[in-house]
Amino acid sequence: MEKVPGDMEIERRERNEELSEAERKAVQATWARLYANCEDVGVAILVRFFVNFPSAKQYFSQFKHMEDPLEMERSPQLRKHACRVMGALNTVVENLHDPDKVSSVLALVGKAHALKHKVEPMYFKILSGVILDVIAEEFANDFPVETQKAWTKLRGLIYSHVTAAYKEVGWVQQVPNTTTLPATLPSSGP
């Protein structure tokens, strides 16, 4: 964190770099194996996200009351949202060669979550950390450092595009409510 005038802390933003050809191939190879089980992987990601960061459930009237991970796994609404999340990620991963398409897709996601759903953008960073954790576990024996770095770079790129969309629509950060903020952030990198 770095200080800016007014004693506000902001995250230092890394340059929004595109992935290299080798990084794109590493991400796409990993993703192809994950996406083969799209719904189950998506559900596992969302269940972990909501169990570890229950404040995120506040945006989902259909399952915000659920505490039991098994109940969440069985929820048709959660499963449907998991498929939407995985579908959006799939579009991004399939189009890593086309920065304009990636930017367009993530702008739509960001604007919808800012304007329609009123989701705090920090949840994108948290969710992407959970995604990286699940990928690392799925490929524990086959997730080399280069691939981890490529996914971490993609995570930063996604967050950068989504938060740019929030800024574009004039998002004003909501006043923090200690009952809705996550206690900790995921352990994954930037």
UniProtKB/Swiss-Prot annotation:
Domain of life: Eukaryota
Domain Globin: from-to ranges: 18-167
Binding site for heme b: H81, H113
Keyword Metal-binding: yes
GO biological process terms held by the UniProt record: fatty acid oxidation; negative regulation of collagen biosynthetic process; negative regulation of fibroblast migration; negative regulation of hepatic stellate cell activation; nitric oxide catabolic process; oxygen transport; removal of superoxide radicals; response to hypoxia
EC number, as in UniProt: 1.14.12.-, 1.7.-.-, 1.11.1.-, 1.15.1.1
Disulfide linkage: C38-C83
GO molecular function, one term: superoxide dismutase activity
Subcellular location: Cytoplasm; Nucleus
Keyword Phosphoprotein: no
Induction of its expression: Up-regulated upon hypoxia.
Tissue expression remark: Widely expressed (at protein level).
GO cellular component, one term: neuronal cell body
Regulation: The nitric oxide dioxygenase activity is activated by a reducing system composed of cytochrome b5, its upstream reductase CYB5R3 and NADH.
Description of post-translational modifications: The formation of an intramolecular disulfide bond between cysteines Cys-38 and Cys-83 specifically enhances the nitrite reductase activity.
Keywords in alphabetical order: Cytoplasm, Disulfide bond, Heme, Iron, Metal-binding, Nucleus, Oxidoreductase
Function: Probable multifunctional globin with a hexacoordinated heme iron required for the catalysis of various reactions depending on redox condition of the cell as well as oxygen availability. Has a nitric oxide dioxygenase (NOD) activity and is most probably involved in cell-mediated and oxygen-dependent nitric oxide consumption. By scavenging this second messenger may regulate several biological processes including endothelium-mediated vasodilation and vascular tone.
UniProt similarity note: Belongs to the globin family.
PANTHER family per the UniProt record, alphabetical: CYTOGLOBIN (PTHR46783:SF2)
Name of the molecule in the record: Cytoglobin
